[in-house]
């Protein structure tokens, strides 16, 4: 039995893949703050046996009540990274295993790291539960590739570069590959990479170069900080340098600069027509 929290773009993909494996996932529930989104996902999948529910993922008590009612063996968290800790806490209180695709970050600071979630490690171990963090593509598959290479192809890994290239074209002037708020927060904060036992900080998108990708060709690639670096240098101590690169088109970056210049990338509250809004969330 699996409970999926989140019915956005990533949650929709996860629900479809889970539903394609009924031999593994015999019972499925999708839960979100907006139940109608969950119902729309179920309709798109075409499996009326999938259950849906409304839940506030910021509320531990609501989560615990839902978990105790449905009794899943695992919760797949594809909600927002701000909600990782409340969902992990609810899993501990309900005795449920946990999996997510992105590490925790606080709402009021554009900064993410694993320390907040790693602090739960002993509690999950003591409860006999498993928590798998960062199990998307990057982080996730990128870590699996690294582990496979270390096990089967190299005596040790000293230099690691993870490259993320999107060669698709949606013919839109500006669109993000996942939640726009999280995506823009990620790429507008300082870059970081690991070298000789230290973390080196760079300005946002300061370091870039052309990288040539198989079957795609050269693409402008920008150094970012990505959470799997923190985990990989810890688990593969032979690494001397670890970096993460992502491709962006110039049109995308131009729109991003405009968003920043007009203040719409701000994550603090401002007053608009007598209401308190966060510009990036409003966008």
Regions found by a protein language model. Give the residues of each.
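Hydrophobic/small residue at the entry helix of a nucleotide-binding pocket
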Residues: 10-11
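Short beta-strand element of Class I
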Residues: 27-29
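Helix N-cap at the beta1-alpha1 junction of Rossmann-like dinucleotide-binding domains, i.e.
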Residues: 34-36
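Rossmann-fold cofactor-recognition segment
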Residues: 45-59
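Conserved Rossmann-fold cofactor-binding substructure of NAD(P)-dependent oxidoreductases
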Residues: 57-72, 79, 83
């Amino acid at each position: 039995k699996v409970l999926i929290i989140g019915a956005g773009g990533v949650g929709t993909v996860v629900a479809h893949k889970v539903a394609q494996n009924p031999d593994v996932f015999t019972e499925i529930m999708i839960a979100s703050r907006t139940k109608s989104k969950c119902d729309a996902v179920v309709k798109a999948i075409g499996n009326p046996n999938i259950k849906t529910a409304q839940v506030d993922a910021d509320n531990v008590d609501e989560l615990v009540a839902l978990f105790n009612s449905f009794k899943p063996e695992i919760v797949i968290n594809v909600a927002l990274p701000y909600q990782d800790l409340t969902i992990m806490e609810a899993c501990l209180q309900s005795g449920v295993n946990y999996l997510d695709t992105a590490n925790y970050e606080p709402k009021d600071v554009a900064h993410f790291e694993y320390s907040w979630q790693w602090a739960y490690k002993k509690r999950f171990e003591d409860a006999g539960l498993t928590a798998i963090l960062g199990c998307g593509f990057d982080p996730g598959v990128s870590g699996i590739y690294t582990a496979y290479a270390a096990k089967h192809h190299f005596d040790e890994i000293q230099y690691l570069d993870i490259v993320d290239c999107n060669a698709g074209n949606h013919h839109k002037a500006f669109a993000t590959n996942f939640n726009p708020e999280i995506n823009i927060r990620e790429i507008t904060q300082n870059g970081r990479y690991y070298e000789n036992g230290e973390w080196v900080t760079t300005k946002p998108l300061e370091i870039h170069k052309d990288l040539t990708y198989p079957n795609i060709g050269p693409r402008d690639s920008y150094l970012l900080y990505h959470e799997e670096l923190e985990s990989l240098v810890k688990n593969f101590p032979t690494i001397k340098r670890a970096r993460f690169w992502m491709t962006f088109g110039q049109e995308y970056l131009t729109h991003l600069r405009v968003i920043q210049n007009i203040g719409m990338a701000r994550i603090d509250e401002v007053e608009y027509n007598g209401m308190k809004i966060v510009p990036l969330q409003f966008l």
